Amino acid sequence: MTTVSEAPVSRRPERVRPAGYARVRLGRGSFLLHRRAAVVAVALTVLLAGVSVAYLSVGESFIPPSEVVRVLSGQPSPDELVVGTLRLPRMVVGLLVGLAFGVAGALIQTVARNPLASPDIIGISQGAGALTVGAMTFGVTSFAVLPYLSVAGGVLAAALVYVFAWRGGLHATRFVLIGIGFAIALRSVTTLFLTKGDYLVAQQAQVWMTGSLNGRGWDEAAPLGWLLVALLPAALWAAYAQRTVSMDDDTATALGVPLGRVRLGLVLLGVVLASVATGAAGPVDFVALLAPQIARRMTRTAQIPLLCSALLGAVIVVFADLLARRLLSPTELPVGVLTAAVGAPYLIWLIVRGRTGRPGRTAGGNA
């Protein structure tokens, strides 16, 4: 009797889809989309649109939202001067600044694995501010130059913090503590510039140091927008690279991921974004601290969602500036005063909760 053995049927192993994700097909390719993060992103987009319309409506003279929509859609309106020329440029600058701070905070906190690793806490914003204020006291006040000086100051401060914190790896707690030390030192340098400079220039620089959107127009909005558009490809890469950074170092090394270079690239992008935003509006404190952690809690994801963090940062800045304009009208408050009033208690809460990093935990392999 002859027995016939059947050849085993080879089957391609099915890809395991993580819980909470949906596979979205786009042409021949596909990608995973976190359902809750997508819903939160849509909700934040709607919220940002609503806050923006309210921002353009409320002022010395109230303009109905219907007229605001008419102006934004390009239709003729008697309120075109107030909405399109006076309020819209300032709102756009605030929106772009919030987007930049939101992404910058998310990237730096992801690399450091520490919710306190915010650009305005670890010295990056202070470095950008010190060089910018120093230039202002020596007569450089052109917005065509100040953002680039701000980027240079932020990158230099970040490089110093990175070098001093590196001990065979980037220890999260050491990174934050050394950054705080540099932030204090750089604030002292900024104060020195303010005391040695011309009185009127020092007064202007002091307002800028609190974080202010007062007087911002299209001359500031246009270069800021183009800079952020130029950084968009890097931001898309960062959204993909976040997953590799969150891996265990041994796992990433086994998969051949150049973890050190990826982390360095993410930090550099975060520093540039924070410095550009600082150059445009001054060091608006705590936006980069608040937005990533709130976005993560809203989406309940393992990594900080970049898009949600960016949108939330924009909502925070635009809404805070709306309150800053109207709370003590006709006197305007710097937007940084409002964000600090919310961010400082949140920072205290983080420290009390003990979320300053675990001993022995590092955030860097070989760089």
Predicted regions and their residues:
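Alpha-helical transmembrane segments in inner-membrane proteins
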Residues: T2-A367
